[in-house]
Every structure is written in structure tokens, then in C-alpha cells.
């Protein structure tokens, strides 16, 4: 799989009372991101706790990252769309060869970036605030976006698009407000390079859609902060699932600092363009199940049908019927036909 991460120090961890309090706040907000003043108050409170005072200062971004990561996890559990596989039906991740061929990245669709107004979407009036969640006119579905911050190179959910501008040189830019941040954190972002459709948190059964060579959004935990960065999957170690869910491990290389780390599936968000793999795999599983159902009745019918050997010189007689000629005439040696089974000498 590769070497383990080495970032010079232990990763920051929240203690149990802090996690319990943040989970209660997230529940009160119906899994929505709390306001900045709430997160800053939590950071100050945790820093002044007896366990941390004078030792570790909890930063606002660490609080924000925890809420963001937990919201991703809850969204992955709650949004179970049709066509996704059930872990209980696939206890082992050793897929048959025909299924492996289905999910090979032969023709992966290109990453969906925002290029001005997306197809099927109506441009907003000038000066109005455009939400970061938009409805696509093609299939009446919602599109959510994420943007890459120039301050730290990490990706954040877009709460709203505030304005746009066309530069004389270079690509157009859009001013975004990141989810959970206030106006002072607004940024002008390159539309073509750093705005795209939001990455998808992975359910336990979706590890089969994460393959070596994929671009993923990976949660990197450092000594002072934990952020979502682009990464390339270098290798995947498939393991048997259990009651805890997916136990597979993935070796990734982060694009911003070229560091490598072995991560579980819960830290990976896959790109939306990999949805076709899950759909193809789902279709393959259904086809296999249907073929097995057709084979079982055929086997039952074959067991009830009298056996007839083509070219056989001796007819097969039912046990209950008796032919007087068989007992009256001496047995004659019958040469087996070309289709009859032969018994090797010495096997009796």
C-alpha cells in the first residue's frame, strides 16, 4: 500500500465532551452549518477548558472543519439514491471478473466545472445573490458547487455566488461566499479552474467505485488544521466489510504538497462523474441475479424430465416396469456408441 503519513506531529483531535457538545449543536441546527459566531464561541470555550488551557489553542477553522466533515458523513448516510448497492449483499469485496470489467475507468466523463452559466440554467439578474445550490433545467435536479480557496488551497462548499467579472486577460471570475463563513471570507475565484460540482461523500458500499488513478477530494488532518484537498488515488486495498461498514484502505497523494497517506473510505469524497460506475455495477448485479433465477427453474425441470441419450442402443426403462424378454433371453454385449460414457479399466 505504501508508507504511512508523516507530517511531523500528531493530528489534532477533539475530546469526547467537545464532540458531544458539537453534535448537540449540529442537531439543533438540523445538520446545517451554524453561524460563525457560534463556531468562534466554541473555539474560545474549548481553548479555556481545563484539558487545553495553556496547552492547545483550538482554532475557528478546526471547529468549522469538524462540522463540515460531520455534515458530509450525515449526508452520505441520509442520501441513499436508487441504484446503490447494499453492503449486506456484498460481504466480500472480491468481485467476479465480469464485474471488475464493468467498473474499469475506460471512459470517465470529464470533471464538471462551472463555465459561466451551466447548460439548462437561467442566468441570475445583475446584482442579485445566486445560491450555491441551483436547479438544473435538464432533469430538474439540484446542483451543488464547491470552490477552491486561494488562501489555503482547500475546497469548500459554496453557499452563494455574489458577483462575476470578465477580465481583459485570463478566465472570468466569480465572487463566492463559502458555507459557514462570513463576508470577510468572500473570495474571487477562477470559474473554469476552481469552481466545480460538489464532490460526493462515499457510502460504505461505494468503495468499489474508487479506483487507482481517480481524482478525489480527501480530508487531510494535520497538526494544526484539517481540510479537504484534491488527491490522486495510487492504490486500493480491498478488505472484507463487517458491521462497522467498509474497512478498505486507500493510498492517496495530495496534489497541493505531494504527500502520501493511507486513508479509510470515510475521508474520501468521490467526483460526481464516477456515478456511472455504480450504475453499471448495479445493472451487472441485477443481470447476474436474474440469470441465477432463470437457471434454478431450468435445473428443476431437467431433474423431472426422463433422460434420453442420443444414439444409445439400450433403452432406459423405468424401475417399476418389467420386460419378460429381459429375463428369458441371455444378456448380450452391446458396444457403446460414440456418445455413451466409458468407464476406465480398474475403476470398478
Swiss-Prot record:
The keyword GTP-binding does not apply. One of its GO terms (cellular component) is nucleus. GO terms for molecular function: chromatin binding; DNA binding. It comes from the Eukaryota. Keywords: Nucleus. It holds the Pfam family SAWADEE. The keyword Nucleus applies. Residues 154-260 are annotated as: SAWADEE domain. Its main location: nucleus. It is found in: Nucleus. Residues 324-341 have a biased composition (Polar residues). Residues 318-348 are annotated as: Disordered. May play a role in the recruitment of Pol IV to genomic regions associated with K9 methylated histone H3 that are targets for RdDM. The SAWADEE domain (154-257) binds to mono-, di-, or trimethylated H3K9 histone peptides, but this interaction is blocked if H3K4 methylation is present. This is Protein SAWADEE HOMEODOMAIN HOMOLOG 2. It comes from Arabidopsis thaliana (Mouse-ear cress). The lineage of its organism: Eukaryota, Viridiplantae, Streptophyta, Embryophyta, Tracheophyta. The gene is SHH2.
Amino acid at each position: 500500500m505504501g508508507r504511512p503519513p508523516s507530517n511531523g506531529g500528531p493530528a489534532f483531535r477533539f475530546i469526547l465532551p467537545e464532540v458531544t457538545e458539537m453534535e448537540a449543536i449540529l442537531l439543533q441546527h438540523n445538520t446545517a452549518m451554524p453561524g460563525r459566531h457560534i463556531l468562534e464561541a466554541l473555539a474560545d470555550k474549548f481553548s479555556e477548558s481545563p484539558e487545553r488551557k495553556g496547552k492547545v489553542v483550538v482554532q475557528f477553522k478546526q471547529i468549522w472543519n469538524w462540522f463540515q466533515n460531520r455534515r458530509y458523513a450525515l449526508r452520505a448516510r441520509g442520501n441513499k439514491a436508487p441504484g446503490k448497492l447494499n453492503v449486506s449483499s456484498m460481504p466480500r469485496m472480491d468481485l467476479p471478473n465480469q464485474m471488475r470489467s464493468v467498473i474499469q475507468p475506460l471512459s470517465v466523463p470529464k470533471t464538471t466545472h462551472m463555465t459561466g452559466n451551466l447548460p439548462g440554467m437561467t442566468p441570475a439578474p445583475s446584482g442579485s445573490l445566486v445560491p450555491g445550490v441551483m436547479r438544473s433545467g435538464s432533469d430538474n435536479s439540484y446542483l451543488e458547487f464547491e470552490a477552491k480557496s486561494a488562501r489555503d488551497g482547500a475546497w469548500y462548499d459554496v453557499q452563494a455566488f455574489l458577483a462575476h467579472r470578465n477580465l481583459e486577460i485570463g478566465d472570468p471570475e466569480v465572487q463566492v461566499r463559502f458555507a459557514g463563513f462570513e463576508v470577510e471570507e468572500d473570495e474571487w475565484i477562477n470559474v473554469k479552474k476552481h469552481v466545480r460540482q460538489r464532490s460526493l461523500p462515499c457510502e460504505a458500499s461505494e468503495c468499489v467505485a474508487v479506483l487507482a488513478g481517480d481524482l478525489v477530494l480527501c480530508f487531510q488532518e494535520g497538526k494544526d488544521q484539517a481540510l479537504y484537498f484534491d488527491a490522486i488515488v495510487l492504490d486500493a486495498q480491498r478488505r472484507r466489510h463487517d458491521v462497522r461498514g467498509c474497512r478498505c484502505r486507500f493510498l492517496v497523494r495530495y496534489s497541493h504538497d505531494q504527500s502520501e497517506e493511507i486513508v479509510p473510505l470515510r475521508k474520501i469524497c468521490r467526483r460526481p462523474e464516477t456515478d456511472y460506475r455504480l450504475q453499471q455495477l448495479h445493472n451487472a448485479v441485477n443481470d447476474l441475479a436474474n440469470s441465477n433465477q432463470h437457471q434454478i427453474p431450468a435445473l428443476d425441470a431437467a431433474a423431472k424430465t426422463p433422460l434420453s441419450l442420443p444414439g444409445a442402443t439400450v433403452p432406459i426403462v423405468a424401475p417399476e416396469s418389467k420386460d419378460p424378454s429381459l429375463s428369458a433371453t441371455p444378456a448380450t454385449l452391446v458396444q457403446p456408441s460414440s456418445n455413451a460414457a466409458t468407464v476406465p479399466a480398474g475403476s470398478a
